[in-house]
Amino acid sequence: MDPTRPPFRGSPFHTPLGVRPPVLETKEEGPHGRAVLLPRGRALLGASAPSSDTTQRDPSDSRNVLPALFRGMGIETKPSGIPGRGGPVFGRGFLSTMSSGDGPDQPLSEPSIRPSLSTRVQQASDFSTERVALGRARFPIPPVSMEKPHVPTGRGLLFPSVLPTLTSDPVPKESPIATLQIEKEEKWEPLPKKGSKGSPCQLGLNLIKINFQNEAVYQYHVTFTPIVECRSMRFGMMKDHRSVTGPVTAFDGSILYLPVKLAQTVELESERRTDGQKIKITIQMTKILDPSSDLCLPFYNVVMRRVFKILDLKLVGRNFYDPASSTVLQQYRLQVWPGYAANIRKTDGGLFLLVDITHKIIRSDSVLDIMNILYQQSPENFQDEVTKQLVGSIVITRYNNRTYRIDDIEWNMSPKDSFSMSDGSKISFIDYYSKNYGITVKELDQPLLLHRPSERKAPKGKALDIVLLLPELAFMTGIPEKMRKDFRAMKDLTQQIHLSPKQHHISLGKLLKRIESSADAKNELQRWGLFLDTDIHMTTGRILPIEKINLRNNSFPAGEDLNWNREVTREACRSSVHLLYWAMIYPKRASAQAQELSSMLERIGGPIGIRVNHPNCVELRDDRVETYARSIKSLLEGEGKVQLLVCLISGTRDDLYGAIKKLCCVQNPVPSQVINTRTISQPQKLRSIAQKILLQINCKLGGELWGVDIPLKSVMVIGMDVYHDPSRGMRSVLGFVASINSCLTAWYSRVVFQLPNQEIMDSLKLCLVAALQKFFEVNHSLPEKIVVYRDGVSDGQLNTVENYEIPQLQTCFQTFDNYNPRMVVIVVQKRVSTNLYSTATGQFLTPQPGTVIDHTVTNRKWIDFFLMSHHVRQGCGIPTHYICVMNTANLGPDHLQRLTFKLCHMYWNWPGTIRVPAPCKYAHKLAFLSGQFLHHEPSIKLCDKLFFL
């Protein structure tokens, strides 16, 4: 740092109006919910609960009760009512205490500055009508009005009520527990999802079977008379009666879970310490649960979090890491922390602990080190460069292992500035870190990093605070941009991250041994009657039959590695379009490369059945965006017919690429090919690269490269995906691609722009009706069956797809007279934690492409399967999860699995299989191009071509 010019100091600092006091920090040990009750008059967004600890809960309260708790209570009350204060607590969060029975401790937070104007509105709760905060939550509270509710669109779809209807009468002093009846869960019947095609294979899964010692878990409803509104006071009263309930409890304020059976009704008495009032506590058994019940999963996951903490694993975000076992890449100044992403799931095979191996990349340089480097490189534009480099980055503070996003830099503040503690006393940042963490701050003139927490992380009853961090104590995470372009560096890093199946199994085995060798960890599990298997779960899967690839004059099996690059570059394509009238634009310094590429395309076109004429060459004086744009407009407006426009550009330039694509896809529609001169700069590789370019050009002109046998007749296959660009705040883009011929080799595409961050699509009718009309033009009939592959949907949105998107699709059929096709809708999930290991040879290897498993690990509520369709060269085999949410075509499991596998062969940008069906990949490419570069719907003239490849 330049001693004569402190680069970090700005204008004098003025003490902020509000300060959030630092308090001791603990992690909330329960799932976080979103569906909550709000009193009348309170805004649905940004409203704050009363500051007192009452039964009415704030949307930001992470300790809200799961709606599933009351769903299983069997409470029968009057219809259409409202709870008063102190009534049963509703919500989605769960269990702030476990076996300890203590209330939540105060968290130790970062020094933070509260905004001067509160973004929340506090209003006292009353007994009037409650409204519902709708969002991603799957179980919104039912409306209280008897009128038909308005159904909003988007993620917050209002589903039928799953909670007991509540009374609008004043709440009685005593809860009507006499109406509670003990009931047992209904038995579950497995869905018909197992296929039979293919050869069996032995598989290992990254699942550990959970076994039970207890026969049941007992659910109780706890009533306090008179009503005790303070939640922590209720925790304290229940803690006083551990001699009755036992040391192991899960209590959320009104619902109590125990591994032991009490009498049907237990009455206890406590004294309220604030006024000496005698409080009657009535514990009423409401349900006998199987130990593997869904209602038990939240506190089982809390138990596992405690086990990981006992093993001295550090919680960072949602995963646990082991910094003590980190690998240091000294030459790149990086640390790689190994860790585990674990959660308990109930599947068709029972209750399992799913453990995925994960890694956290931590840079050895602090944010302050990066600031010093930037200052040395550009002292004049120092602050601008720092803002450009750091804002939006994720940092970790090692003293508490928490991650933060940098939203801004406070140049006018330093560690010497002070803030107010909860008791009103002032303390500087220097003293705060020294007192609480024993850290001595060395750089006193450094600015502070600013982080704005999201609304859902706001403490109960408090406005959103601004977190301030010291650059000296914050470390960058992730891979540096410069390193991403270094092939050797990325190779060294991926060797540490992409573990082989054998290494995966060893890591999982080490975790199980650590749990087994820790008496405290085993005791934590046994308190709830849980114990784990000593190894991962083994089962049997299937390898689907190898598909046959069809070219124009030849057919051949795909082979074990599922790659047919040699065949498609030596034999004629299934259907080709001759390249007769095309143009090539390039800067003057790339003229030699342009001539070589043109000559090579003419030579290699013959074997693959494409005749290539000499192009109309346009040489540019420079490579500015304006020069390209002017030449392209002049060429396309002056020429009578141009089949294709090829542009050579130097380097990776998003601005130039976007300008070319806008001109060719929106303003003057023509298929275009943009080629980086670096790609064709090596003569020894030019032939193979030119072959790939020509095959891609053939697709863009409407040609077909290869196909597979499709036994289904009169079928349309649709792929849908959504692209989001949150960094730019642009609208979301829906990519829609549908097949329009019988062999699924011709495609029709459309794009729909949506509101920001809107995943559920609102404009399907426009796309599907246009696709059906195009299908009719080609085939002179409408499809009898429609198969939809919907990408980018999480488990929590499955019901929304079923209840909202599918009805939109079905309304399209009313456009045509007497048309009611059979329909299949399959959700495609790529981001899964399930790993497959082949154990056929006695060793843990990557499964063969075509490996499918449709049992054990599958979802109990849906017909689904996991398919490993692609060839993996490095790391573990991560399958793709397919969930069938609708099937009126009566396609069996074998039909669904084999059709999906066939479509994974049909992506023409790669002569092999890919992770998802081709229409999904096409939809993704289309949505990405439109959202990232075009920012507009492509011209309708290009809809029947794969112009977006």
From Swiss-Prot:
It is an enzyme of class 3 (hydrolase). Residues 1-125 are annotated as: Disordered. CDD domains: PAZ_piwi_like, Piwi_piwi-like_Euk. Residues 366-478 form the PAZ domain. It is found in: Cytoplasm; Nucleus. GO terms for molecular function: metal ion binding; piRNA binding; RNA endonuclease activity. Endoribonuclease that plays a central role during spermatogenesis by repressing transposable elements and preventing their mobilization, which is essential for the germline integrity. Plays an essential role in meiotic differentiation of spermatocytes, germ cell differentiation and in self-renewal of spermatogonial stem cells. Acts via the piRNA metabolic process, which mediates the repression of transposable elements during meiosis by forming complexes composed of piRNAs and Piwi proteins and govern the methylation and subsequent repression of transposons. Expressed in oocytes, testis and liver (at protein level). One of its GO terms (cellular component) is nucleus. Belongs to the argonaute family. Piwi subfamily. One of its GO terms (biological process) is gamete generation. It comes from the Eukaryota. PANTHER family: EUKARYOTIC TRANSLATION INITIATION FACTOR 2C. Its EC number is 3.1.26.-. Its cofactor is Mg(2+). The active site is at residues 721, 759, 791, 924. Residues 644-935 form the Piwi domain. Component of the PET complex. This is Piwi-like protein 2. Keywords: Biological rhythms, Cytoplasm, Developmental protein, Differentiation, Endonuclease, Hydrolase, Meiosis, Metal-binding, Methylation, Nuclease, Nucleus, RNA-binding, RNA-mediated gene silencing, Translation regulation. Its main location: cytoplasm. Methylated on arginine residues; required for the interaction with Tudor domain-containing protein and subsequent localization to the meiotic nuage, also named P granule. Residues 115-125 have a biased composition (Polar residues).
